[in-house]
Swiss-Prot record:
Residues 1082-1094 have a biased composition (Basic residues). Interacts with CAMSAP3 and CTNND1. Interacts (via WW domains) with TSPAN33 (via cytoplasmic domain) and with PDZD11; the interaction with TSPAN33 is dependent on PDZD11 being bound to PLEKHA7 and facilitates the docking of ADAM10 to zonula adherens through interaction of TSPAN33 with ADAM10. The modification Phosphothreonine is found at residue 870. One of its GO terms (cellular component) is pore complex. Residues 115-131, 460-475 have a biased composition (Polar residues). The lineage of its organism: Eukaryota, Metazoa, Chordata, Craniata, Vertebrata. Its main location: other. The modification Phosphoserine is found at residues 536, 545, 569, 604, 608, 612, 858, 860, 867, 871, 903, 907, 986. SUPFAM superfamilies: PH domain-like (SSF50729), WW domain (SSF51045). This is Pleckstrin homology domain-containing family A member 7. GO terms for biological process: cell-cell adhesion mediated by cadherin; epithelial cell-cell adhesion; pore complex assembly; zonula adherens maintenance.
Length: 1121
């Protein structure tokens, strides 16, 4: 992958670089006239088609043969070996192969003449041979059908953790073999490479895909992919193979190429991934802008690479970088290997041999295809007989050179600045003659010059030769003499310009000749290629019209000043860079490489009539009969003149009108720039008063709250989704409890989701805290604005002058408008913050229980009151079960959960009832009786208290009948002036009830009911821990509407809670105070009689165990009946 940054500024002097058609980058030494794959400064390859491994020394790479054997390439010594250069061991992948080292691992002449039929990553390198003769040196005796792919786990490129990540996320990837199932993988796009992992922890890379050699696009119907939001990554070589072969699928897989299919979850994710991956795939073309990746990809025949003829060894090709700086082999990207099995790959072994080889070569393409295919890159050896080079301005060759050398398809020619003006004049005449003869040739004119003096029109009978000593590009693949042209291509592209060229390629020569616009368009392309090749906007190339060439050379050869330059459209113009001084360049090198951003990312720029050669220029192609505004190619450097072809075939008046229109367009552009410069530099005052400042800050805080609300809402949605999925996994865990394999998979998924859930909850809590802080600040600002409003209203009332009142009124209106606009969101913010502070459902008590006041500050704290841990509000069933639970709770003199609170009289409306029948919290154990009451009697021994557990069946039946009758008679609704007893008190406590009821300030207010709980009095002189632990804390709940008369009544002893527990009375009816007291009195009498009856029997049973004591009999606390 990209181990070094490519760029003109990063290269030393006399160095340049070239880009192969498949995206590989090599470097050219203009002094030694040789090529290398290694960057001259870093000593590492940038993109040579092989893998860079971290465990290899500098200048080493790993390659793979067609059979799948791994070998190592030393670009420093230009050798290959199967052994690791550091460990000296064979790769574990080669265990199934029989490897045989050759004594001379360098490439031989015979090897360079033969082209392997398939190779890794669409490259022809020294290490990717498929035959015994064309291998990197070591022989592979065992042949195998194993196909290497970068996406495999073992051959994956190691990811550099220091490179920032562009995009990461989940995608579905289709398997390359088997049933081609879709698997969900975690993908990371970094360092122009797509890595994928099993999960988001990114622990072990499953595979990697180097994107610069791929094109990413949505799936097509022929892909037979029915999955939604699917897209694919197709290798550039695969694309040409698909368009040229009907059986490209299997052949592509067999030749080492592969198409990757991906699927996103949403359309937005798919668009984002396709955009990011395409940008990574085109990074080389964007960084250099010397060759547009889109155009390189569109070319239907292999584009020749930079190839240098080395003086020491007389060889050409980027193979120098793999084998040696002075020896190498052809490294040609062949996109049509399936159709060209018999073609031969030749290299220049010596000047004479090279001439003989090139004289035999023939071009299978028509002249129009020649121009269309070799427009952007100065291609390989396609020229006339070599002649001594002469220095010409801008790299233009004298007229004696064949036009094929000047139209961008000739060999590389070194050029130097001119010294005399006659040379410039000769250049103009030469170019003019070339244009005319080329136009005649396109129209089939028999009066054209001899074949070797025309523009690029090379037929089968034309002889080809090279300049003698220095070639920039290797030979492109050619058909044998007499071979037919390849079928038309239709390569997709993002630019309309590419579509025009693709449709142009589909046309036959006759159609092209018949289409008059096609001729003009080809002439325009040739002109632009000439100017691009020679790298200067001031190279005067005056073109004649095809219509004028038939009438002679003397008509209307307009030479328009080069400064008149009309861009095609503002969106196609890259912004001009700052002026820089560049060292002497190669003639065909563009003056500047400018990154062209997509249209949606460009900013509008103004292009002036600057004379800088680095300004991008556009042009609208027109003729007399058809006006077609074509899109120009996005190139780092393009020179478009107003002269050619938009002025062809027009009279003087038409030409004047055309030039006037162009100048008006430029005037408009200049007007915008002048207005920009003449803008007033008057400072801007945002706020006029402190009211403006305060309101702006207030609105800013509202925006902060909105952003936080959006984040919290998104996090909550993610949390809910994760929790729902985890709930399903929990059910699956229970369902597949007997299947360990399923359990392991489910547990692994559950672990990952739980980690994500923890992360989301932590983020949600953090955002909620920020939301709460922002809300507090919002309330503070709101209060400040309200105070400011009141102040302004007061000033408005006291203001005397009309102007002052008007200004204050404006400020008041501003405040009113802002507050009215913000009021819509305020309620949402408040609900969100309150949901965090006070959630609706409180399953676990997050706060202490409601506090209980004491009788006085001098009294000691009451003993603890145990409570069920499940809910702070006790249900009626829990109240009945509570005495049984109290037996096992030890005594604590200072309970931590009880605190003193404000008296209910001070805040009588704080308690908000929700359910009328819910019982209030149970009060703590009482300590003292009121002074006027008699002290209670000593409770009975534990063995007597347990007799109630052995009540006879007849006694229990009698109690049950009485309770049933009471329920039938007591179904009445309490009024506000009636007393409702929620629990039961003993007889000594009833004696003091009248005094307690007169003191409502000592009561408890339930949190969700309107009842006041009056705590009963405990034992004043009790010292026994057993007695205290076994004493039940009775309490009475009264309506707040109690009057003094009803509170002074003397109540009989009610039935204890323990008796109610054994009686099974689970439905309590609402009874009046009189009915309830009467019922309790009857029960008390029945209990006393029953106790006396069974007293003797209880002494004989002998079960005195305090551990089983639930509570003392309430009747024994003071039997007054």
């Amino acid at each position: 992958m990209a181990a070094a940054t490519v760029g003109r500024d990063t290269l030393p002097e006399h160095w340049s670089y070239g880009v192969c058609r498949d995206g590989r980058v090599f470097f050219i030494n203009d002094q030694l006239r040789c090529t290398t794959w290694l960057h001259p400064r870093t000593g590492e390859p940038v993109n040579s088609g092989h893998m860079i491994r971290s465990d290899l020394p500098r200048g080493w790479e790993e390659g793979f043969t067609e059979e799948g054997a791994s070998y190592f390439i030393d670009h420093n010594q230009q050798t290959t070996a199967f052994r690791h250069p550091v460990t000296g061991q064979f790769s574990p992948e080669n265990s199934e192969f029989i490897l045989q080292e050759e004594p001379n691992p360098h490439m031989s002449k015979q090897d360079r003449n033969q082209r392997p039929s398939s190779m890794v990553s669409e490259t022809s390198t020294a290490g990717t041979a498929s035959t015994l003769e064309a291998k990197p040196g070591p022989k592979i005796i065992k042949s195998s059908s194993k196909v290497h792919s970068f996406g495999k786990r073992d051959q994956a490129i190691r990811r550099n953790p220091n490179v920032p990540v562009v995009v990461r996320g989940w995608l579905h990837k289709q398997d390359s073999s088997g049933m081609r199932l879709w698997k969900r993988r975690w993908f990371v796009l970094a360092d122009y490479c797509l890595f994928y992992y099993k999960d988001s922890r990114e622990e072990a890379v499953l595979g990697s895909i180097p994107l610069p050699s791929y094109v990413i696009s949505p799936v097509a119907p022929e892909d037979r992919i029915s999955r939604k939001y699917s897209f694919k990554a197709v290798h550039t070589g695969m694309r040409a193979l698909i368009y040229n072969s009907s059986t490209a699928g299997s052949q592509a897989e067999q030749s080492g190429m592969r198409t990757y299919y991906f699927s996103a979850d949403t359309q937005e994710d798919m668009n984002a991934w396709v955009r990011a991956m395409n940008q990574a795939a085109q990074v080389l073309s964007r960084s250099s802008l010397k060759r547009d990746m889109e155009k390189v990809e569109r070319q239907a025949v292999p584009q020749a690479n930079h190839t240098e003829s080395c003086h020491e060894c007389g060889r050409v090709g980027p193979g120098h970088t793999r084998d040696c700086p002075h020896r190498g082999h052809d490294d040609i990207v062949n996109f049509e290997r399936q159709e060209q099995e018999g073609e031969q790959y030749r290299s220049q072994r010596d000047p004479l041999e090279g001439k003989r080889d090139r004289s035999k070569a023939r071009s299978p393409y028509s002249p129009a295809e020649e121009d269309a295919l070799f427009m952007d890159l100065p291609t390989g050896p396609r020229g006339q007989q070599a002649q001594p080079q002469r220095a010409e301005k801008n790299g233009m060759l004298p007229a004696s050179y064949g036009p094929g050398e000047q139209n961008g398809t000739g060999g590389y020619q070194r050029a130097f600045p001119p010294r005399t003006n006659p040379e410039k004049h000769s250049q103009r005449k030469s170019n003019l003659a070339q244009v005319e003869h080329w136009a005649r040739a396109q129209k089939g004119d028999s009066r054209s010059l001899p074949l070797d003096q025309t523009l690029p029109r090379q037929g089968p009978g034309q002889s080809l030769s090279f300049p003698e000593n220095y070639q920039t590009l290797p030979k492109s693949t050619r058909h044998p003499s007499g071979g037919s042209s390849p079928p038309p291509r239709n390569l997709p592209s993002d630019y309309k310009y590419a579509q025009d060229r693709a449709s142009h390629l589909k046309m036959s020569s006759e159609e092209r000749r018949a289409h008059r616009d096609g001729t003009v368009w080809q002439l325009y392309e040739w002109q632009q290629r000439q100017q691009f090749r020679h790298g200067s906007p001031t190279a005067p190339i005056c073109l004649g019209s095809p219509e004028f060439t038939d009438q002679g050379r003397s008509r209307s050869m307009l030479e328009v000043p080069r400064s008149i330059s009309v861009p095609p459209s503002p969106s196609d113009i890259p912004p001009p860079g700052p002026p820089r001084v560049f060292p002497p360049r190669r003639p065909h090198t563009p003056a500047e490489r400018v990154t062209v951003k997509p249209p949606d990312q460009r900013r509008s720029v103004d292009i002036s009539l600057g004379d800088s050669p680095r300004r991008a220029r556009g042009h609208a192609v027109k003729n007399s009969s058809h006006v077609d505004r074509r899109s120009m190619p996005s190139m780092g450097y393009m020179t478009h003149t107003v002269s050619a072809p938009s002025l062809h075939g027009k009279s003087a008046d038409d030409t004047y009108l055309q030039l006037k229109k162009d100048l008006e367009y430029l005037d408009l552009k200049m007007t915008g720039r002048d207005l920009l410069k003449d803008r007033s530099l008057k400072p801007v005052k945002i706020a006029e008063s402190d009211t403006d400042v305060k309101l702006s800050i207030f609105c800013e805080q509202d925006r902060v709250l909105q952003d936080l609300e959006d984040k919290i809402r998104a996090l909550k949605e993610n949390k809910d989704q994760l929790e729902s999925v985890l709930e399903v996994l929990h059910r699956q865990m229970e369902q597949y409890r007997d299947q360990p394999q399923h359990l392991e998979k489910i547990a692994y998924q559950q672990k990952l989701l739980q980690e994500d859930l923890v992360h989301i909850r932590a983020e949600l809590s953090r955002e909620s805290t920020e939301m709460e802080n922002a809300w507090n600040e919002y309330l503070k600002l709101e209060n400040d604005v309200e105070q400011l409003k009141q102040t302004l209203q007061e000033q408005h009332r006291r203001a005397f002058f009309f102007q002052e009142k008007s200004q204050i009124q404006k400020d008041l209106w501003r405040i009113e408008d802002v507050t009215a606009g913000l009021s819509a969101n305020k309620e949402n913010f408040r609900i969100l913050v309150e949901s965090v502070k006070n959630p609706e459902r409180k399953t676990v008590p997050l706060f202490p229980h409601p506090p209980v006041p004491s009788l006085s500050t001098s009294e000691s704290k009451p003993p603890p009151q145990p409570s069920p841990p499940t809910s702070p509000v006790r249900t009626p069933l829990e109240v009945r079960l509570f005495p049984q639970l109290q037996t096992y709770v030890p005594y604590r003199p200072h309970p931590p959960q009880l605190r003193k609170v404000t008296s209910p009289l001070q805040s009588p409306t704080k308690a908000k009832p929700k359910v009328e029948d819910e019982a209030p919290p149970r009060p703590p154990l009482p300590e003292l009786y009121s002074p006027e009451d008699q002290p209670p009697a000593v409770p009975p021994l534990p063995r007597e208290a347990t007799i109630i557990r052995h009540t006879s069946v007849r006694g229990l039946k009698r109690q049950s009948d009485e309770r049933k009758r009471d329920r039938e008679l007591g179904q009445c609704v309490n009024g506000d002036s009636r007393v409702e007893l929620r629990s039961y008190v003993s007889e000594p406590e009833l004696a003091t009830l009248s005094g307690d009821m007169a003191q409502p300030s000592l009561g408890l207010v339930g949190p969700e009911s309107r009842y006041q709980t009056l705590p009963g009095r405990g034992l004043s002189g009790s010292t026994s821990r057993l007695q205290q632990s076994s004493t039940i804390a009775p309490y009475v709940t009264l309506r707040r509407g109690l009057n003094a008369e009803s509170s002074k009544a003397t109540f009989p002893r009610p039935k204890s809670a323990l008796e109610r527990l054994y009686s099974g009375d689970h439905q309590r009816g609402k009874m009046s105070a009189e009915e309830q007291l009467e019922r309790m009195k009857r029960h008390q009498k029945a209990l006393v009689r029953e106790r006396k009856r069974t007293l003797g029997q209880g002494e004989r049973t002998g079960l005195p165990s305090s551990r089983y004591l639930s509570r003392p009999l309430p009747g024994d606390l003071g039997s007054v009946c």
